[in-house]
Structure formats: structure tokens, C-alpha cells
Regions:
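Short secondary-structure boundary motifs at beta->alpha junctions and helix caps
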Residues: 176-184
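Metal-dependent DNA phosphodiester-chemistry modules and their immediately adjacent helices/loops
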Residues: 108-110, 145-177
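Cleft-lining beta-strand/loop regions that shape enzyme active-site pockets
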Residues: 1-146, 183-191, 197-205
């Protein structure tokens, strides 16, 4: 809706302002195909020349994107395409080859627990925000005779190499920070501000 679009637009403007135009911002509203296409278009389109990307997963109710996000943001530059002495693009050109950081909150659910877990576990980047409850399972949606009543029945677990399951394993962010009500009503987003600072610090340390 309009309120959501305004919220995303404000966050993108904040990241642009706080980073001096160095970072881009994307929000993954749901772990589904339309959300992935939107993120893909933004990071390889209007943010292609940015030094890093802030990936916001807050308030995401889940779906199935953990593999797609892992592949998209784990690109490693192996060469640059040059046309008559002018750089055209880095390769791979269909993946993000530069630094990124992910923002989470307590309202993340299901695959919005699994996706940040994979992102952190694979060492793609830091996770900033609040812990995410261990809700990574896949469900079968069952509708009753009254079609307004339906339930998601957990049927798929995600087993780790040690034999345990990801479900009930709370994800702890690398940088834990809450958005206080006092700051929220002023329009300030401490989690986003922290993510920008952390990512810029990482980028500058590699120069």
C-alpha cells in the first residue's frame, strides 16, 4: 500500500543521505518472486554504481528466498569487461560483487529467519538489528470448509550438519540494536543508521 511505499522511500532517502550517496537500500517485503525481482532490478539497476547495499528484511513474514539471496549477494569479482579502453562492467554482472549488510528485527518470521541465518552463516556480511526467533520451517497451507479459516501446518524442517534443526535456534545479530519508541516517533531509525555506519566502516577499512 501507499504507507509501505512511503516507508521504503523514506528509508532509501535516509541511507542515501547518511552515506553521502555511497550506499543503496532495498527492502525485502516478502520472500517471494516479486520481491526478489524488485531487489534484483534495484541493486543491478539504479544502485549498480554504489559501493554497498543495505538489505532490510524487517517485518518480513517469510516465503522461500534464502538460496536466491545467498547467490545474489555472494558474487566475487573475477574480471572487468573493457570496451576500447573504457570499463563497461564488472563480472559476474548478474550478481552483487560488493559489500552488503542485512537488517533484522523481532517481527521477522519463517524464511525471514532462515535468510538472515544463511547470509550470516555463509559470511556474506554482517547482520544488524534485533534477534530473530527460530521460526525457519516450511508449512503446508490447509483450508477448512469455511475458506476464511486456513492453517499453515509445519511439515519441512531444515537440518544442520550437526544433526540439529534450525527451528528454535534464535538468530543473534552481529550488532544488536533496538529502535526505541522515542526515536521512532521522531522518524529516526537507529537500526538503519547503525547499518550504514557499519557498512561504511567495512568499506573504508578495505581501501
Amino acid at each position: 500500500g501507499l504507507l509501505y511505499r512511503r516507508w521504503v522511500k523514506q528509508r532509501a532517502a535516509d541511507v542515501d543521505r547518511l552515506s553521502g550517496g555511497r550506499l543503496g537500500y532495498v527492502h525485502i517485503s516478502s520472500m517471494d518472486d516479486p520481491s526478489f525481482r524488485s531487489v534484483y532490478a534495484d541493486i543491478l539497476g539504479k544502485y549498480n554504481d554504489r559501493e554497498g547495499i543495505v538489505i532490510d528484511t524487517r517485518f518480513n513474514g517469510g516465503g522461500r528466498l534464502h538460496e536466491d539471496i545467498e547467490i545474489l549477494f555472494s558474487g566475487k569479482k573475477y574480471f572487468t569487461q573493457v570496451v576500447r579502453g573504457r570499463e563497461a562492467c564488472d563480472m559476474p554482472s548478474r550478481r552483487w560483487n560488493k559489500p552488503s549488510i542485512m537488517v533484522t528485527c523481532e517481527a521477522n518470521y519463517s524464511n525471514a529467519h532462515g535468510t538472515p541465518w544463511v547470509y550470516q552463516h555463509q559470511g556474506i556480511g554482517k547482520v544488524v538489528g534485533m534477534p530473530v526467533p527460530g521460526t525457519m520451517t516450511s508449512v503446508s497451507w490447509e483450508t477448512l470448509q469455511d475458506p476464511t479459516l486456513y492453517f499453515g501446518i509445519p511439515i519441512v524442517g531444515y537440518r544442520l550438519p550437526d544433526g540439529s534443526y534450525l527451528e528454535n535456534k534464535q538468530l543473534e545479530p552481529d550488532v544488536k540494536i533496538a529502535n526505541s519508541p522515542e526515536k521512532i516517533i521522531k522518524g529516526e531509525d537507529e537500526q538503519l543508521e547503525t547499518a550504514v555506519k557499519e557498512l561504511l566502516k567495512e568499506i573504508d577499512s578495505k581501501k
